[in-house]
Amino acid sequence: VKVEVDTSIRLVPEATGKLLAWASGLEGSTNTYLEQTKALAQKLGAYYRPDGLTEIGFWVPGLIRDVLHEREIYLEVFTPQEPIDWQAKEQSIKFKRDRLHLEQQGEYIWGVVSGMRAGNREQAGSFYWLRYVDQAERLRTIRDLLPISLPYGIFAPAELYDIDRLQANRTDLDYLERTAKSGNSKRKPPRVGDPKNVLEIHVGTASPEGTIAGLTRIYQEISTKIEQGQPLTPTEQNYVGYDAIELLPMEPTIEYRDEYSPESEFFAFTTGEDSRENDNDIVEIELFKPNTQDWGYDVPILGSSTTNPALLSSLRPDEVVDFIATLHNFPTYPIQLIYDLVYGHADNQSELLIAREFMKGPNMYGQDLNHQLPMVRAILLEMQRRKINTIGDEQYCSGDSRA
């Protein structure tokens, strides 16, 4: 099977060469193997650079032995040709599909690409994943493990997002500047003080909306009342008086499905998914707003760097930052945020989504993760780093389904 490649979105050879040289240079460095893998993990996923180019990296252990011909591995990009209504429960959207080959280097695939659109609060970005044809001539998918935005769930392609713009426009920059300064020069990075009392919240049941935006609304209304000297209702009083809020896990969760299949039920092709020719570059996709919520511990690991879209009213990462900024700017004193992160196990559904090298074997919750493998450990640490970069002041890691 020959895969024709559309060149509307292009690989930038010079910039890609620099990325490859950097990655290969790590092997000759004096860093430990774990330090090397941590550096590589920071380049995985898709990063929209200030110069308008997009850096892309995938870890693909064992992929080459599953592919009939090396050049049948390609990046597939879907760019919306009309606005997406983030509130709509169901809609049909036309996407322009582009395909291009990236560069393979050992267990990694790298590229610097021009022409991809970055998403932001107002607009949808390009969606992307890797595709390949296996030795049985079946079309297979490799998804981004560390996306910034995953609006249509774990089985759908990730969305390229302008994370630098998101961070630059947040409304708690004064708080971040203050807490970035430490009176103790030996403490790097600076640390905020330990909270004395913590309110644990399950996002899906803590507001009528069942979303992060619903929590933001509640705390903004409470803030307004405090600033105006108005009394709080008995219900509102339950949300205040705490130094920190700990949110039960917000990572993308498993999806309840009719069949044990790797196909997305929220990002469903109505035309052209299996077309491998160049003459049909417009595909129509039925989008369904994700609605899978639970206690948060049934995780597939994929996408743990971002938020379960079922908890996002807007399906935009900005919604989380808006909530954090509301807490940091609370009128009485800043309220810290604590993330509950689950890296001790993965649900069995993860076997459809991530490389088998991630798993060590079954346990009572699904699959044990292979923490002893340096690249797995490095990716989990990178997921944590990206999550904390939204400025959850602390994190709590669950070693099992609930520690």
Regions found by a protein language model. Give the residues of each.
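Short, flexible loop/turn elements at secondary-structure junctions
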Residues: 60-62, 79, 117, 134, ...
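Extended charged low-complexity segments that act as oligomerization/scaffolding linkers
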Residues: 80-89, 161-180, 379-382, 403
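Short, acidic/polar
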Residues: 211-237, 376-385
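Extended low-complexity, serine/threonine- and proline-enriched intrinsically disordered segments
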Residues: 58, 64-89, 132
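Acidic/polar, low-complexity linker and loop regions
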Residues: 91-94, 193, 292, 300
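The feature marks proteins involved in alpha-glucan
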Residues: 1-67, 94, 104, 108-110, ...
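Substrate-binding/active-site clefts of carbohydrate-active enzymes
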Residues: 234-243, 248-403
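Solvent-exposed serine/threonine-rich low-complexity stretches and specific carbohydrate-binding patches
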Residues: 85-104
